[in-house]
Protein backbone atom coordinates (compact mmCIF):
# COMPACT_ATOMS: atom_id res chain seq x y z
CA UNK A 1 0.00 0.00 0.00
CA UNK A 2 1.17 3.51 -0.80
CA UNK A 3 2.64 5.67 2.00
CA UNK A 4 0.12 8.14 3.38
CA UNK A 5 -2.85 5.95 2.44
CA UNK A 6 -5.65 5.08 4.83
CA UNK A 7 -4.57 1.71 6.26
CA UNK A 8 -7.48 -0.22 7.81
CA UNK A 9 -6.44 -2.20 10.91
CA UNK A 10 -9.78 -3.09 12.53
CA UNK A 11 -13.43 -3.35 11.47
CA UNK A 12 -16.53 -4.05 13.56
CA UNK A 13 -19.99 -4.34 11.98
CA UNK A 14 -23.22 -5.04 13.87
CA UNK A 15 -26.30 -3.55 15.45
CA UNK A 16 -26.10 -0.50 17.75
CA UNK A 17 -28.08 -0.33 21.01
CA UNK A 18 -30.45 2.11 19.24
CA UNK A 19 -31.30 -0.54 16.60
CA UNK A 20 -29.37 1.03 13.74
CA UNK A 21 -26.60 -0.84 11.98
CA UNK A 22 -23.10 0.32 12.81
CA UNK A 23 -19.73 -0.07 11.14
CA UNK A 24 -16.66 1.06 13.06
CA UNK A 25 -13.44 1.38 11.06
CA UNK A 26 -10.03 1.95 12.69
CA UNK A 27 -6.95 3.04 10.75
CA UNK A 28 -3.30 2.38 11.60
CA UNK A 29 -2.60 6.10 12.11
CA UNK A 30 -4.52 9.24 13.02
CA UNK A 31 -6.39 10.88 10.14
CA UNK A 32 -8.87 13.69 9.65
CA UNK A 33 -11.82 14.32 7.34
CA UNK A 34 -9.54 16.69 5.40
CA UNK A 35 -7.53 13.63 4.31
CA UNK A 36 -10.55 12.76 2.13
CA UNK A 37 -10.43 16.07 0.23
CA UNK A 38 -9.70 15.89 -3.48
CA UNK A 39 -7.50 18.89 -4.24
CA UNK A 40 -6.81 20.55 -7.60
CA UNK A 41 -9.51 18.62 -9.46
CA UNK A 42 -8.54 15.24 -8.03
CA UNK A 43 -11.32 12.91 -6.82
CA UNK A 44 -12.38 13.00 -3.17
CA UNK A 45 -11.63 10.05 -0.94
CA UNK A 46 -14.18 7.87 0.81
CA UNK A 47 -14.60 5.08 3.31
CA UNK A 48 -17.34 2.64 2.32
CA UNK A 49 -19.11 -0.36 3.76
CA UNK A 50 -19.83 -2.60 0.77
CA UNK A 51 -22.91 -4.81 1.30
CA UNK A 52 -23.88 -8.03 -0.49
CA UNK A 53 -27.40 -9.36 0.13
CA UNK A 54 -28.87 -12.84 -0.33
CA UNK A 55 -26.68 -15.30 -2.18
CA UNK A 56 -24.53 -12.64 -3.85
CA UNK A 57 -20.83 -13.33 -3.34
CA UNK A 58 -18.14 -10.64 -3.13
CA UNK A 59 -15.79 -12.71 -5.28
CA UNK A 60 -18.21 -12.80 -8.23
CA UNK A 61 -20.65 -9.85 -8.02
CA UNK A 62 -20.52 -6.13 -7.30
CA UNK A 63 -22.04 -5.06 -3.97
CA UNK A 64 -25.79 -4.48 -3.75
CA UNK A 65 -25.42 -1.42 -1.51
CA UNK A 66 -22.75 1.03 -0.44
CA UNK A 67 -22.75 2.97 2.83
CA UNK A 68 -20.11 5.64 2.31
CA UNK A 69 -18.62 8.56 4.17
CA UNK A 70 -16.62 11.42 2.76
CA UNK A 71 -15.63 14.93 3.82
CA UNK A 72 -18.50 17.37 4.40
CA UNK A 73 -18.70 20.84 2.83
CA UNK A 74 -17.02 22.48 5.85
CA UNK A 75 -13.95 20.22 5.31
CA UNK A 76 -13.87 19.34 9.03
CA UNK A 77 -16.73 16.87 9.42
CA UNK A 78 -17.89 13.72 7.68
CA UNK A 79 -21.11 13.13 5.75
CA UNK A 80 -22.60 9.77 4.81
CA UNK A 81 -25.35 8.09 2.80
CA UNK A 82 -26.65 4.68 1.73
CA UNK A 83 -26.51 4.06 -2.01
CA UNK A 84 -27.91 1.22 -4.12
CA UNK A 85 -25.73 -0.06 -6.95
CA UNK A 86 -27.36 -0.09 -10.41
CA UNK A 87 -26.13 -1.99 -13.47
CA UNK A 88 -24.44 0.28 -16.01
CA UNK A 89 -25.25 3.41 -13.98
CA UNK A 90 -24.07 5.40 -10.99
CA UNK A 91 -25.30 4.32 -7.55
CA UNK A 92 -28.62 5.78 -6.40
CA UNK A 93 -28.89 7.42 -2.98
CA UNK A 94 -31.60 5.54 -1.05
CA UNK A 95 -31.22 6.59 2.60
CA UNK A 96 -29.43 8.82 5.06
CA UNK A 97 -26.56 7.63 7.21
CA UNK A 98 -24.44 9.34 9.84
CA UNK A 99 -20.68 9.37 10.12
CA UNK A 100 -18.75 10.33 13.24
CA UNK A 101 -15.12 10.30 14.22
CA UNK A 102 -14.98 9.32 17.91
CA UNK A 103 -11.17 9.01 18.01
CA UNK A 104 -8.20 10.17 15.95
CA UNK A 105 -7.99 6.78 14.22
CA UNK A 106 -11.62 5.58 14.13
CA UNK A 107 -14.74 6.51 12.17
CA UNK A 108 -18.23 5.10 12.67
CA UNK A 109 -21.09 4.76 10.17
CA UNK A 110 -24.69 4.35 11.41
CA UNK A 111 -27.78 3.71 9.31
CA UNK A 112 -31.23 2.10 9.48
CA UNK A 113 -31.46 -1.62 8.74
CA UNK A 114 -34.49 -0.79 6.58
CA UNK A 115 -32.12 1.01 4.17
CA UNK A 116 -30.95 -2.47 3.17
CA UNK A 117 -34.47 -3.94 3.12
CA UNK A 118 -34.24 -5.56 6.59
CA UNK A 119 -32.14 -8.59 5.61
CA UNK A 120 -31.63 -11.43 8.09
CA UNK A 121 -27.93 -11.35 7.23
CA UNK A 122 -25.48 -9.81 4.79
CA UNK A 123 -21.87 -10.05 3.68
CA UNK A 124 -19.65 -7.00 3.87
CA UNK A 125 -16.30 -5.50 3.06
CA UNK A 126 -14.80 -2.11 3.86
CA UNK A 127 -12.77 -0.02 1.45
CA UNK A 128 -10.88 3.20 2.16
CA UNK A 129 -9.31 5.57 -0.35
CA UNK A 130 -7.54 8.81 0.54
CA UNK A 131 -8.57 11.94 -1.34
CA UNK A 132 -6.76 12.73 -4.57
CA UNK A 133 -5.75 9.18 -5.37
CA UNK A 134 -6.80 7.39 -8.55
CA UNK A 135 -4.40 4.46 -8.20
CA UNK A 136 -5.29 1.01 -6.89
CA UNK A 137 -2.36 1.03 -4.47
CA UNK A 138 -4.16 3.81 -2.55
CA UNK A 139 -7.14 1.55 -1.84
CA UNK A 140 -7.23 -0.58 1.30
CA UNK A 141 -9.85 -3.25 1.94
CA UNK A 142 -10.86 -5.23 5.01
CA UNK A 143 -11.12 -8.10 5.16
CA UNK A 144 -8.57 -8.34 2.37
CA UNK A 145 -10.41 -8.75 -0.94
CA UNK A 146 -11.95 -11.01 -2.14
CA UNK A 147 -12.77 -12.21 1.39
CA UNK A 148 -15.77 -10.78 3.23
CA UNK A 149 -17.31 -10.63 6.68
CA UNK A 150 -20.81 -11.81 7.53
CA UNK A 151 -23.39 -10.27 9.87
CA UNK A 152 -26.50 -12.11 11.11
CA UNK A 153 -29.24 -9.80 12.34
CA UNK A 154 -32.05 -12.15 13.44
Put a short name on every predicted segment.
Residues 7-12, 22-26, 106-110, 121, ...:
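Ser/Thr- (and often Asn-) enriched beta-sheet segments in non-cytosolic proteins
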Amino acid sequence: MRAGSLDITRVSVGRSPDGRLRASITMAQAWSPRDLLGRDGAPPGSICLRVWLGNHRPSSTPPDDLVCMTVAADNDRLKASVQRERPNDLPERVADATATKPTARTATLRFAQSALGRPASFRFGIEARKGGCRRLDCLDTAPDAPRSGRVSLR
